[in-house]
Amino acid sequence: GDALVVGGGDSGYQILNEISKDASRTVYFSGDTTVKSLPQNFLGKTLWWWFTVVGFLSYSKYSWIGKKINSSTQPVIGTDVKGILTRENVIAVGRTKDALNNDVFFEKQKVSTIKNVIWATGYRPNFNWIQGLELDANGYPKNYRGVSNIDGLYFIGLPWMYTRGSATLGGVSKDASYLANVMVTKDNIK
């Protein structure tokens, strides 16, 4: 039956791509249709290889370029966003407002034929259960390179802990090394 994909990030567009290949179903899309996309491969190398070579993943979040990257909308990588959105069976419907019984309400219309809903709005952190932990406006722990305001509590692998690469397998090692040094120094002081 007809489907609805909610969410315009990498996962949302990848799922939209896969399920809209079957032209016999209408797929409604509720997400950002203005997002930029980048190819997964460029000149025979992965985009992540290029990011590493040019230092893109190493910019500090405190540098002017790090601040600019961090405040920008992140592109969708490896998915032809414009191509998917031009398929005849894909209908962009704007923001999803509500649902009741078989009706889904969007900004400018109501659809009653949707049988499947895929919610791909991303991951949201939940650190509220850690008493005394200071959180930023996005719900992530306030920290300096993984060191929190609570003595002995550290974080690793969070987005933009220190660099763009902090949440990637290739970039986490710098943060891990820093945290290891902090912990060794603290243990030696005590």
Label the model's feature ranges.
Residues 1-190:
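Flavin (primarily FAD) cofactor-binding/catalytic cores of flavoenzymes
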